């Protein structure tokens, strides 16, 4: 069984145990905060938008530096992040909906709930906890599930980041006409990363959609390798959690976009 399959089985177990129902009962409702739309930054900013991630660990990185997460979010906003991503998976990524609930209150930026969503109730919990964006991973959803969950989120005034890794997944994503697609440079089955993977998939980009490069971005040089693919933004976690000079590092990633679309 791959790590991804293991994670999905775990999510199904949580659904059976009414884990998400309990979260809806105990979380403070923070779902109606007015925030700028991520799509506006992606469409109108002349530099790459950065979704800055709060991350404690992952299957590929067992432990990241301990940070004051409240200060980390404030610094992300201070140094130019366009959105905040907060992992809510407890077992594999060390996150929680309580963390999302707490941190979403201290920022006016768009907030992404980063999780493995397979059911509508997870979207309900994400919104209640304070998310304004949810992640849908094409690899773990059927076409019907993808369409249903996407529509459900949009109808609940959430933005959706639709994540793909292969050309086939990109084709499936394009069928629902999303506004934002994320190209994951990490193979979720093997957890191997290649930042140049973005360039391969962006050859098939459509003009009515914005594209974000996710995973494997550790340096300004990594961004320079992919900026000419006409990406609109980046999702960066590990490198931002590790750096001791956030004031210099985060702005250095916001390269000027290649505005000459092919």
From Swiss-Prot:
Reaction(s) catalysed by this chain, per the record, are: 1-(2-carboxyphenylamino)-1-deoxy-D-ribulose 5-phosphate + H(+) = (1S,2R)-1-C-(indol-3-yl)glycerol 3-phosphate + CO2 + H2O
Write out the GO MF terms. Answer: indole-3-glycerol-phosphate synthase activity; phosphoribosylanthranilate isomerase activity
SUPFAM superfamilies associated with the record:
Ribulose-phoshate binding barrel
Matching Gene3D superfamilies, A to Z? Aldolase class I
Q: Is this entry keyworded Lyase?
A: yes
Supply the EC number(s).
Answer: 4.1.1.48
What metabolic or biological pathway is this protein involved in?
Amino-acid biosynthesis; L-tryptophan biosynthesis; L-tryptophan from chorismate: step 4/5
Q: Name one Pfam family in it.
A: IGPS
Question: What PROSITE patterns does the record point to?
Answer: IGPS
Query: One of this protein's GO BP terms?
Result: L-tryptophan biosynthetic process
**Organism superkingdom:** Bacteria
Xref: InterPro entries: Aldolase_TIM, Indole-3-glycerol_P_synth, Indole-3-glycerol_P_synth_dom, Indole-3-GlycerolPSynthase_CS, RibuloseP-bd_barrel
What keywords are annotated for this sequence in UniProt? Amino-acid biosynthesis, Aromatic amino acid biosynthesis, Decarboxylase, Lyase, Tryptophan biosynthesis
Q: What class of enzyme is it?
A: lyase
As for family, the record states:
Belongs to the TrpC family.
Task: Write the protein's name.
Answer: Indole-3-glycerol phosphate synthase
What organism, scientifically named, is this protein from?
Answer: Staphylococcus epidermidis (strain ATCC 12228 / FDA PCI 1200)
Q: Which gene encodes it?
A: trpC
